[in-house]
Amino acid sequence: RGRLEASGLSYKSEYNTGSDVGTMRVTFSDGLMKHITAKEGTYNIILHATDVRNRTNEGVLSISASDAVVLTKEVTEGDIWTSRAVLRGGLMKETSDPLIFRYRITGSSDWKEVEAVLNGKEMTAAITGLKVATTYEYVAVAGEKASSVVCRFTTEKAAQLPNAGFEKWHGSKPTYVYESGGTMFWDTGNHGSQKAGTDITTADGSVKHGGSYSAKLESKFASMLGIGQFAAGNVFSGKYLATNMDGVVGNGVLGWGRPFESRPTALRGYVRYQSNTVNYDNSCEFIDKGDPDIGSIFIVLGNWPGETYGGETWPVIVRTNYKTPGSAQLFDVNSEYIIGYGEKDFTSSTEGEGMIEFNIPVEYRYTNRKPTAIIIVASSSKYGDYFSGGTGSTMWLDDFELVYE
């Protein structure tokens, strides 16, 4: 606060408990206003707000200073994708001249032009066909009079998933989905089923799309001396953290999510699914014995604040509970931290003995926020986190690819 006041900026926050509304008054000193208006430009002040439940949000207070007809403004972070963006500017004086933006790859000589859309005093233009991970510059123009402010942005990277073809494996009971000495991205429930001397997710060279292997996820009754529990074959981005024993049954603790900042529009890959009849329902309210089992794949991008277990912080921590499923800490598909989400259920076996292509569109709930993590989960029994499904239900996965527009 002292540094802000020294620069000429002061503020006062108030919270009305009756209306449950907070307000902030920001005051600019005469010296700061003189400095801001000394040359054409836009100044952005980022405002952070935190509520009593420690949930945060932020907004931008944008101040424009210009004696020109139009002023180029910085793009909004969420408007920059891999191959498209929204340019922004402001109308400072009324004019009958046509309003456009000029843009180009930084360092090139040729400008492209696009017509601006005027909404009140705000100018915007959506541009497409941009190059991935490339820096562009742009300027707002009225007639032939261009703003003296040139702004820049860099398109997103089209990041892909490590070991997306499921070619790298090592170990047995548990089997790991990465090479020995390598870096883990994917993990499985093999750490839990190993106590019963079995793996539920393995490499398979007999069913595949490309390369040498696919990932084979098989639902099993993992038991020792006849005592055990149903376990769904699964693979997820993250890490299996622990098995907490409750008598003779085990409850898994999983850290879901890996760092990720790009925004794909879909997850594409290849799958074969064999659905068996549900023979364990563990009182699950979503599926009954005798029903056909359901396979599931979902992708989530979000900016979760993170949860800590064993000294490690993960975007999401999942805790299953065999005896009292209602007390489990399962994934919340309605979380406010989810930015983009897509899922696909397989309610019956896929046709034939080979793999078929699947495509899961990602629907973005927010476009003004960027993700910090990606969660991808696949299961041979959708309700495996309730210890419910059909033994023998099997899902093969291969050649995952993130699709970008």
Locate the predicted segments by residue:
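Low-complexity "stalk/linker" and mucin-like segments enriched in Ser/Thr/Pro/Ala/Gly
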Residues: 2-30, 107-117
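Conserved structural position at the C-terminal beta-strand
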Residues: 49, 140-142
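Extracellular/luminal low-complexity segments enriched in Ser/Thr/Pro
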Residues: 30-40
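Aromatic (Trp/Tyr/Phe) and Gly/Pro-enriched flexible surface segments
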Residues: 152-264, 290-296, 300-302, 308-382, ...
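C-terminal edge beta-strand
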Residues: 56-68, 148-156
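Proline-enriched interdomain boundary motifs that mark the N-terminal boundary
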Residues: 68-75
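Short, flexible loop/turn segments at beta-strand junctions in immunoglobulin-like
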Residues: 36-37, 126-131, 364
